[in-house]
Amino acid sequence: MGFRFLDIVKPFTSLVPEVGQPDRKIPFREKVLWTAICLFIFLVCSQIPLYGIRSTDSSDPFYWAKVIMASNRGTLMELGISPIVTSGMVMQLLAGAKLIEIDQSVKADRDLFSAAQKLFGMLICVGQGVAYIWSGSYGDPAVLGFGNCFLIVLQLFFAGIIVMLLDELLQKGYGIGSGISLFIATNICETIVWKTFSPTTVSVGKGTEFEGAVIALFHLLLTRNDKVRALKEAFYRQNLPNITNLLATVLIFMVVIYFQGFRVDLPVKSTRVSGQQGTYPIKLFYTSNIPIILQSALVSNLYFISQLLYRRFPDNILVNLFGAWRTSEYSQQMIPVSGLTYYISSPNNMSAVLADPFHALFYITFMLTSCALFSKVWIEVSGSSARDVAKQLKDQQMTMKGHRDTSVIKELNRYIPTAAAFGGLCIGALTVVADFMGAIGSGTGILLAVTIIYQYFETFVKEQQELSGGIGGLF
């Protein structure tokens, strides 16, 4: 039996900023404009440096999740979408486990639950800000002083609120999609383009090379006498983006888009209008990119906690079992070398897989299991289970052809849980393959980018269908 946690939140709802529901139907062009404005605000905040910091040269605790969490080191977007994703994940899982009692059919409960998510997200902003300072990410806290430390946390707090409001603005229908998806896709695509065409030079043992894979290819071919060796280096150079990584990225993009088309169309008909028929599609990626977002949020927080503990207690046995870390000579970032965090981190390439096959096997098992479980749990807590879909069809005066209302749930249960679990499994498998192939932007990043871009494509198509009306617009 759950407790009325939402009643505890009620007195604080007046402190939570909220975007009101639109009082009219927003035209599609206006939605595009608001989406562009939200993206512009996010990109500007990603370039404004935090006031009061002394240094950002130290290892970044969230280095592993920077691209996925749409964050930018040393700026207002230091935390990115991490607070809102973490708060949403925790609250949804608590509601799904019935530890928080909520009736989704009651508007007051839905509003309180949304306010509770925001409050928790605001607390996470403060907590992560304090943890960043305590870890010395911006310099020695004693040197920074209380005033600067307070200002840094305050800036991160208000930046977190801005992200929440931008996300809510889009989700309430003023724009297209969600802020979280928009910011993730933008950050990942920016990273892929930069690592492909970056003109930045990097000093390596053989001299100076360009960071961008394509730029480096032409540079090596033009400056090296041995063209075959130059081509080989451009394809297989270590610790910098290479052409093989780029080709792997393109391949994964194409495979994910191909799998997006896999679906089962269930025939439905209207119980009100005779002869009106349509289909209800159940996709292979039924929960879309949610499993990988939740898995990334879980892992990034585990990394964060592990690094903080290891910096303070490097000789503690339990801390070392959780994760031991060292500084990479190439990126100057902390990387896990043993413990739980090491085994749930991805091997960088096939050489690393062959060097430690147990690590690779553990990582594969962890990714596949966690993505499948998160996908299964998500359909229950997000209102997309067989029972919820059957209720939606009934509310729209629709039913499945050849089935009575009482047997619709049973028929949907044949497809939805399987699609959720198997779809999550496929998402995890594609992520693992992309990681092992060394795809640019990480396997997780590419999966997120492709699924988000595909969602936007579907949204554009749906908008066109709604203009023409009919049953096709419902599904």
Swiss-Prot record:
Major subcellular location class? endoplasmic reticulum
Cellular component, GO, one term: endoplasmic reticulum
Gene Ontology biological process terms in this record: post-translational protein targeting to membrane, translocation; SRP-dependent cotranslational protein targeting to membrane, translocation
Which terms does the record give in the GO molecular function aspect? Answer: protein transmembrane transporter activity; protein-transporting ATPase activity; ribosome binding; signal sequence binding
- What keywords tag this UniProt record? Endoplasmic reticulum, Membrane, Protein transport, Translocation, Transmembrane, Transmembrane helix, Transport
Q: List the disulfide bonds.
A: none
What is the top-level taxon of the source organism? Answer: Eukaryota
Task: Provide the membrane-side ranges marked Lumenal in the record.
Answer: 54-75, 140-145, 195-241, 311-353, 435-440
- Give the bilayer topology: Multi-pass membrane protein
Which residue intervals are topologically Cytoplasmic?
1-32, 97-118, 167-173, 263-289, 375-411, 462-475
Q: Which PANTHER family match?
A: SECY/SEC61-ALPHA FAMILY MEMBER
Which family does the record claim for this protein?
A: Belongs to the SecY/SEC61-alpha family.
- Name of the protein in question: Protein transport protein Sec61 subunit alpha
